[in-house]
Amino acid sequence: MPIIIDKDLPARKVLQKENIFVMTKERAETQDIRALKIAILNLMPTKQDTEAQLLRLIGNTPLQLDVHLLHMESHLSRNVTQEHLTSFYKTFRDIENEKFDGLIITGAPVETLAFEEVDYWEELKHIMEYSKTNVTSTLHICWGAQAGLYYHYGVPKYPLKEKMFGVFEHEVCEQHVKLLQGFDELFFAPHSRHTEVRENDIREVKELTLLANSEEAGVHLVIGPEGRQVFALGHSEYSCETLKQEYERDRDKGLNIDVPKNYFKHNNPDEKPLVRWRSHGNLLFSNWLNYYVYQETPYIL
């Protein structure tokens, strides 16, 4: 939240250089405040788990949020009841004439398919195109980030020989970017994917800025012009047990799945997971909401 200080206070310039949100008394006395409209396009099969993960993070700020859950009309969800979707979700057709302060596009377990082979790709393209003029900032996660990078900037994805699965160390590539305010130079984030985007492809697109990278996991955070589009290739929203649940699910199916790296204590799946990404996960979402949604969105959408 902003700090209200005198516009002539010498510390004001120092704080502004550090991306601390300061506000003059004059602006504070005249500003209009309303709840931020946030849409979550939930592409995950485990919809209720994903709801809790994302709402936990975006709810951990002083901002008042009006959240709208969206699902794909062109896809039949098999892991959630129709009653749940009817009660709590809308489709794009329901909201296409509205504007939103923020949009979150989640990951989806379809990464081994070409984008054009995904049954809801055409609908997703309409939503991503809509976001360019009707949403102040869009946060794309995992496959949602790959889809956004491909649709908006033509960045391809590549198959991995082995699943990128575990918790990995990342390094901040750009200092003094608002999305990374408060980040340590090295931080952890979970990854769970069979495909990747590559650093060279990101750097070849002049509109994109690579913010965080990992020697082992590759590209993690990318941002577009003015923060209108943010891409997170990892899963900073994951709860403590998520990787464990994914590991046990695939193991019980008889799939050849490795133990998630750097996750269980002593790398032993019989021991408890060690959470090393929670603080930076909270920072990522709060910075996105604060700097790229709250501070940038108009009062009248």
Swiss-Prot record:
Organism expressing this protein natively: Bacillus cereus (strain ATCC 14579 / DSM 31 / CCUG 7414 / JCM 2152 / NBRC 15305 / NCIMB 9373 / NCTC 2599 / NRRL B-3711)
Domain of life: Bacteria
Pfam families per UniProt: HTS
Listed pathway(s): Amino-acid biosynthesis; L-methionine biosynthesis via de novo pathway; O-acetyl-L-homoserine from L-homoserine: step 1/1
Keyword field contains NAD: no
Active-site annotation: C142 (acyl-thioester intermediate), H235 (proton acceptor), E237
Biological role: Transfers an acetyl group from acetyl-CoA to L-homoserine, forming acetyl-L-homoserine.
Name by which UniProt lists this protein: Homoserine O-acetyltransferase
